[in-house]
């Protein structure tokens, strides 16, 4: 992260376990902090690869690093084991009831400093935050270095297609589909 020294350092530290899992050097694809405010909505079941990431390369690993404790009550991550081997269900669409018929979403509560690593084909979701306190999670996503460095292009594309509220054209509808 060019904007925050601590996140830049963490992003570098996370490269080691991600590289070990990938079996080669990695580069950061994207990073974010998810803030889930009290009453804040969850995320419908999806695979990260459904959001058009295949335009850049075919495989990513994401590291979730817990900042604030996550619980079932404040909308912790829920993942499905084993279905990442099914590959991409459908690009630009969330998972359907038919896709999820034999999936069991498992809650993954975390404490500050805990890390969860999952790939771009792992079905996952979260529920709304029913607590009276905001909770935060840091996500860093990496791809193989041999597949290229796409970080700048990803953020340029995201800004162009889904700009922050302050930069949106009046009257234009922006829909993030996954």
Regions found by a protein language model. Give the residues of each.
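Signature of the catalytic double-stranded beta-helix
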Residues: 1-32, 55-56
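Short, surface-exposed recognition loops or helix-turn segments adjacent to catalytic cores
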Residues: 29-37, 77-80
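A structural signal for short, well-ordered beta-strand segments
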Residues: 31-33, 63-65, 138-142
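Conserved short histidine dyad/triad with adjacent acidic residue
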Residues: 35-51, 70-72, 120-121, 125
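Non-catalytic surface loops within mature trypsin-like serine protease
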Residues: 37, 67-69, 142-144
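Acidic, His- and aromatic-enriched active-site or binding-groove loops in soluble protein domains
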Residues: 47-64
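Double-stranded beta-helix
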Residues: 70-125, 147, 160-166
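Non-heme Fe(II)/2-oxoglutarate
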Residues: 122-123, 127-178
